[in-house]
C-alpha cells in the first residue's frame, strides 16, 4: 500500500485481566474518531466471550471489530485506516510482530492490547516481542481481590492446564504478587467486594494512564464518552 504520510508507530497496552486494557483501547479509538481519523479494530476469531463482531470491555463498553484467524489477514483488511487497534494480542502467533511492524512502517498508528503474562505468570508470546519494538508501552494494573493491593497477575480459578482458556470473571481474578498462586485455585464463592474492586481497577487504570500521559488526560477531558 502506498500511503502519502510519514511513518506510523506502535503502542502496546498490557497488564493483567481486569486492569482496563480494552477500556483504554476504546478510549484511544474514540479520541482518534474525534480527530476524524479512520479506525479499524481486529481481534482473534477465538475470542467470542461477549460478541463475535465487537471488542467489549469487562464493563461492557464496546466498538465494532473484525475477527481474524491469523495476523496477515489484518494487512489485507486494514485498507486506508489511520489507526489500527488489535485486541487480545496474546492469542495470535508470532506473525503478529512483523505484521504490526509492517503496518507502522506503512504509516498506520497501531495500538496492540494484550496480557503480558499467562496464568502461570510467564511471558505470554508474542507480547514481549511487541513491547520490545513498540514506541510506547502502557502497563496497567488491576486491584487484587484478596488484599486490595495493585494486581499484576491473572489468577486462574478453574481447573485446567491449557495455556489458552478464554474466560472472564468465572475463570480468572486479579491478584498481586504476594497473593498470586502459579497453579489454578478453586474459588467456591464470590469474595467480598470483588465486583467493587474490579470497578476500582478500571478507574485506577484510567488514572494511572492519565498521570503517565498528560496528552491522554487532555483527551479524556475532551471526550465526554471516555471511561
Curated annotation (Swiss-Prot):
Positions contributing to ATP binding: 15-22, 87-90
Active site: 88 (proton acceptor)
Segments forming a coiled coil: none
Subcellular location, record wording: Cytoplasm
InterPro entries: P-loop_NTPase (IPR027417), Thymidine_kinase (IPR001267), Thymidine_kinase_CS (IPR020633)
Reaction it catalyzes: thymidine + ATP = dTMP + ADP + H(+)
PROSITE patterns in the record: TK_CELLULAR_TYPE (PS00603)
GO molecular function ontology, one term from the record: zinc ion binding
Start and end residues of each stretch annotated as Disordered: 198-227
Binding site for Zn(2+): 144, 147, 176, 179
Pfam families recorded: TK (PF00265)
Record field: compositional bias (Low complexity): 217-227
Entry's Gene Ontology cellular component terms: cytosol
PANTHER family recorded: THYMIDINE KINASE, THYMIDINE KINASE, CYTOSOLIC
Oligomer status and interactors: Homotetramer.
Protein name, entry field: Thymidine kinase
Organism taxonomic ancestry: Bacteria, Pseudomonadati, Rhodothermota, Rhodothermia, Rhodothermales
Amino acid at each position: 500500500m502506498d500511503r502519502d504520510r510519514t511513518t506510523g508507530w506502535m503502542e502496546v497496552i498490557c497488564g493483567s485481566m481486569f486492569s482496563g486494557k480494552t477500556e483504554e483501547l476504546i478510549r484511544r479509538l474514540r479520541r482518534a474518531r474525534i480527530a476524524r481519523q479512520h479506525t479499524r479494530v481486529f481481534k482473534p476469531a477465538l475470542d467470542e466471550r461477549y460478541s463475535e463482531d465487537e471488542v467489549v470491555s469487562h464493563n461492557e463498553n464496546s466498538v465494532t471489530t473484525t475477527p481474524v484467524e491469523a495476523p496477515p489477514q489484518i494487512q489485507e483488511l486494514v485498507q486506508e485506516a489511520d489507526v489500527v487497534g488489535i485486541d487480545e494480542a496474546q492469542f495470535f502467533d508470532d506473525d503478529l510482530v512483523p505484521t504490526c511492524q509492517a503496518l507502522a512502517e506503512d504509516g498506520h498508528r497501531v495500538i496492540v492490547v494484550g496480557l503480558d503474562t499467562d496464568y502461570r505468570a510467564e511471558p505470554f508470546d508474542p507480547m514481549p516481542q511487541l513491547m520490545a519494538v513498540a514506541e510506547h508501552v502502557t502497563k496497567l494494573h488491576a486491584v487484587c481481590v484478596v488484599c486490595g493491593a495493585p494486581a499484576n497477575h491473572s489468577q486462574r480459578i478453574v481447573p485446567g492446564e491449557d495455556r489458552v482458556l478464554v474466560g472472564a470473571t468465572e475463570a480468572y481474578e486479579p491478584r498481586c504478587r504476594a497473593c498470586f498462586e502459579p497453579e489454578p485455585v478453586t474459588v467456591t464463592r464470590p469474595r467480598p467486594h470483588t465486583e467493587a474492586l474490579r470497578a476500582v481497577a478500571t478507574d485506577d487504570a484510567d488514572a494511572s494512564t492519565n498521570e503517565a500521559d498528560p496528552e491522554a488526560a487532555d483527551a479524556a477531558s475532551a471526550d465526554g464518552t471516555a471511561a
